[in-house]
Amino acid sequence: MTAEPARAISVMNPWAWRIVAGLQVVVERTWKPSWRGVLWIHAGKDSDLSAPAELWPPAGRLVTSAIIGHVTLADVQGQPGAWRWVLTDPRQLAEPVTGVRGHPGLWLIDLPPGLSA
């Protein structure tokens, strides 16, 4: 039996950090994925500098261009153009996988040996 490929999504900080910390359990997107399951969170190289200071991670915790954890994409609710992705089971990696280039949409990722959901 072949394992299903791992899927990831690139998200700007502080939102990526908030997702894997379990502080953001719903995210809004303009598109609806047909897939559900474990979703690896990639902290993109860019950050949302308009986000209020209280939403940012503690000093020293901000990581960019890295896989920082995973969640389960459990449900998608809404209507065309305004989809709410319901995220459960957040897990933050003790050591982020750095140097990972992000991509738009959901993308397949080759996880390093020994790393699994």
Regions found by a protein language model. Name each.
Residues M1-A117:
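Structured alpha/beta reader/binder surfaces that contact nucleic acids or chromatin modification marks
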